[in-house]
Regions:
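Active-site phosphate/pyrophosphate-binding segments
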Residues: 77-204, 214
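Glycine-rich phosphate-binding loops that contact phosphosugars or nucleotide phosphates
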Residues: 1-127, 161, 208-243, 248-254
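C-terminal functional extensions of proteins
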Residues: 257-259
Length: 259
């Protein structure tokens, strides 16, 4: 959300983990607007952070998947995800729905917004959804790759730059939740600052490479971990791909790739 909003507007965005906000609240100005993101709308830390925000008279928006939840009732504004109930352990539908709502929010906050921009955004999201469906249909290929790179491994690392780094953090969380493999996400440029010492022969590295302006830099990071014997699995896209990349996504608007 921070990356999206700051790229579209002149607004400064600060991100807080709800549990940290609740115990060490930042100094909030009257001009501050607080956005709460919660799948259930019932997370205790988020509820406490909202209580603090309300006590200071600061306006707020809750992005949630559950109509009538505590956060949706006690906030000033609510954006419902309409993603349906999460059945799996990991939140997947709600997460991608949250990203989509944040995209619309970033456009809505622009000083000047053309109607054609919103229409184009809707079209891009619809096209991306169709491409995501194709990936789901081809899940057997993904299963084979997972078996080749991850089965029997103690740990795994995700690397990326820009928005790919953001996705690497969420991807690592998903892998931990579902497989109990120790997984972490790192910014590609930070590998040399200690993290690379954890990489040994056969360590799985999932490299996300969809950001065009940092593509070659991430390729350098891939070579660094390859030199240490890492087993590398690359997800790239048309325009950043190389011949041996395991998954190459189709050409889309770059802001769609986190989905």
């Amino acid at each position: 959300g921070k990356r999206m909003i700051e790229s579209k507007t002149d607004k400064d965005v600060t991100v807080f983990v709800a549990s940290e906000f609740a115990t060490d609240a930042p100094k909030l100005k009257e001009s501050t607007f607080v956005v709460f993101i919660s799948q259930s709308g019932e997370t205790a830390d988020s509820r406490e952070a909202l209580r603090i925000t309300n006590s200071l008279g600061i306006p707020s928006l809750t992005i949630t998947n559950v109509k009538g939840s505590t956060l949706s009732r006690e906030t000033d504004h609510t954006a419902l995800l309409y993603a349906g109930p999460e059945i799996a352990v990991a939140s997947t539908k709600a997460y991608t729905a949250q990203l989509t709502v944040l995209m619309f929010l970033s456009y809505a906050l622009k000083t000047e917004l053309e109607k054609s921009e919103l229409e184009n955004l809707r079209k891009q999201i619809a096209r991306t959804a169709s491409e995501m469906e194709i990936l789901v249909v081809n899940k057997e290929k993904v299963k084979e790759i997972a078996h080749q790179y991850l089965v029997g491994k103690r740990n795994a690392f995700f690397i990326g730059r820009g928005s790919d780094f953001d996705v690497s953090l969420e991807s690592a969380l998903k892998l931990k939740e579902i497989s109990y493999i120790q997984a972490e996400g790192f910014a590609g440029g930070e590998l040399k600052h200690g993290t690379i010492a954890l990489i040994e022969d056969g360590t799985p590295i999932i490299a996300l490479n969809t950001v065009y302006k940092t593509s070659e830099l991430l390729r350098s990071n891939i070579e660094e971990v390859k030199a240490r014997g890492a087993n590398i699995f690359v997800i790239s896209r048309s325009g950043t791909e190389k011949e041996n990349d395991q998954i190459v996504l189709p050409l889309l608007a770059e802001e769609m790739y986190p989905l």
